């Protein structure tokens, strides 16, 4: 429940189309990790010991966070503009987590839910967390989950609301691509992301509504405070929201990912979607009416109940069969919808040099399956022993990042010239 992210700044920009240099939109990554009993795959409450060691290490003291559960630790990354830098830091931190797991005789896993769970979790000793337990009561018994959160820098909250509106139609697909929680309390749920289903119990969850502008967003959030356990704005649990203390938009739909490559793929796609939305606004659109006709149709024509249903569908099927296509509002072969997303953000991926590695990782994802598919295969083949081997092989596996040189593209100057903001 802690945050780290990235900020951007930008001034007025002409509407004339010019040749511009590659954008450097900033981003930050929050990864949550479980420590698990290797014999039962239930959470193991050793995170405080790990935190105390990393919190005094100069390399990690600013990016290591306690989390809600006593079996969790969080890496809240530094601010990045380059995926290769992010890959290096994610891999290094995961190596630390894996090493500490070995010291304490437990397994470290980056998964959305533990394969098995205690009747009620051990909570980190923090007054705010204890208040959440009091307010949410029985919901907390099943709130044993880890997520991946991606912060992307925005030049203003108006741009942020425009981006929020523009990315809503893609949330079902991003949910399908990032599903990594098929197991719960010792059985296969049949879902790719059981965490997504569990989170629907909270007062605010799933796809956020559309907003007309930043003032509308802020007014409606304030109305939620004090209702249904929403004691503060950090408890707004939509799949995507604006940060309240950083100039970022925060994606929250993803389960914690098995490998750093899985994380980097989601981060690159989230950044590209935000860049696309910001560029559309700077080309003459508004938060509620992007100038680009395709983006506008994606944002306006899909009713909230359809997006909500599509997210549940994605949580169930992952990429195994079909996926929700935001261009048609219907289901289509999952691989086709993934490639539609790549087409949608092709220019943005090229401008940051991420296109080649994203395409490579997408092909790997479509070939090998999501984290949920890989967990399910290990579980079905060898039970707990199979999961133990999978987690050991993936927690600190070396990342694969093939980064091409950024390319200048024709368009208005980007609103995403970066200026990092510490958390």
Please identify what each model-predicted range represents.
Residues 114-118, 181-192, 286-304:
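Short proline/glycine- and acidic-rich turn/helix-capping motifs at secondary-structure junctions
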Residues 102-126, 215-218:
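Surface-exposed, low-hydrophobicity interaction/linker segments
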Residues 24, 111, 115, 131-148, ...:
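Metal-dependent DNA replication initiation modules
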Residues 2-100, 104, 128, 132, ...:
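C-terminal accessory/tail domains of diverse enzymes
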Residues 50, 54-57, 89, 96, ...:
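Short, surface-exposed, charged/polar-biased interaction segments
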Residues 38, 78, 106, 111-116, ...:
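An acidic- and aromatic-residue-enriched active-site/binding cleft used to recognize and process polar
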């Amino acid at each position: 429940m802690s945050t780290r992210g990235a900020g951007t700044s930008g001034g007025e920009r002409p509407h004339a189309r010019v040749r511009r240099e590659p954008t450097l939109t900033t981003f930050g990554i929050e990864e949550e990790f479980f420590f698990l009993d290797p014999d039962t795959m239930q959470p193991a409450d050793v995170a405080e010991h790990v935190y105390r060691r990393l919190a005094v290490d100069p390399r990690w003291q600013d990016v290591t966070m306690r989390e809600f559960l006593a079996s969790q630790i969080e890496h809240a990354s530094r601010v990045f503009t380059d995926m290769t830098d992010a890959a290096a830091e994610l891999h290094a931190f995961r190596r630390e987590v894996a090493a500490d797991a070995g010291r304490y005789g437990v397994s470290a896993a980056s998964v959305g839910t533990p394969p098995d769970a205690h009747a009620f979790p051990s909570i980190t000793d923090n007054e705010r967390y204890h208040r959440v337990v009091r307010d949410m009561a029985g919901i907390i018994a099943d709130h044993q989950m880890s997520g991946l959160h991606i912060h992307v820098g925005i030049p203003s909250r108006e741009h942020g609301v425009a981006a929020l509106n523009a990315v809503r139609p893609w949330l079902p697909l991003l949910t399908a691509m990032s599903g990594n929680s098929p197991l719960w309390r010792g059985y296969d749920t049949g879902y790719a992301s059981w965490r997504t289903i569990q989170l629907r119990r909270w007062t605010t969850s799933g796809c956020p509504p559309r907003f007309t502008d930043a003032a509308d967003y802020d007014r409606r959030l304030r109305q939620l405070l004090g209702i249904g356990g929403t004691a503060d704005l950090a408890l707004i649990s939509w799949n995507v929201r604006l940060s309240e203390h950083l100039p970022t938009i925060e994606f929250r739909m993803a389960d914690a990912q098995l490998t750093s490559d899985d994380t980097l793929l989601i981060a690159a796609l989230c950044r590209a979607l935000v860049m696309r939305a910001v560029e559309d606004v700077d080309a003459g659109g508004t938060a509620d009416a992007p100038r680009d006709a395709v983006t506008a149709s994606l944002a306006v024509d899909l009713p909230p109940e359809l997006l909500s249903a599509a997210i549940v569908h994605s949580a169930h099927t992952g990429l195994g069969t079909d996926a929700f296509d935001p261009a048609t509002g219907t289901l289509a072969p999952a691989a086709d919808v993934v490639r539609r997303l790549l087409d949608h953000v092709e220019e943005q991926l090229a401008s940051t040099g991420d296109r080649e590695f994203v395409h490579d990782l997408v092909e790997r994802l479509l070939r090998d399956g999501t984290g949920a598919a890989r967990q399910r295969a290990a579980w079905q083949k060898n039970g707990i022993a199979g999961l133990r081997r999978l987690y050991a092989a993936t927690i600190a596996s070396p990342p694969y990042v093939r980064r091409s040189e950024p390319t200048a593209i024709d368009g208005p100057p980007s609103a995403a010239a970066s200026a990092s903001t510490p958390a």
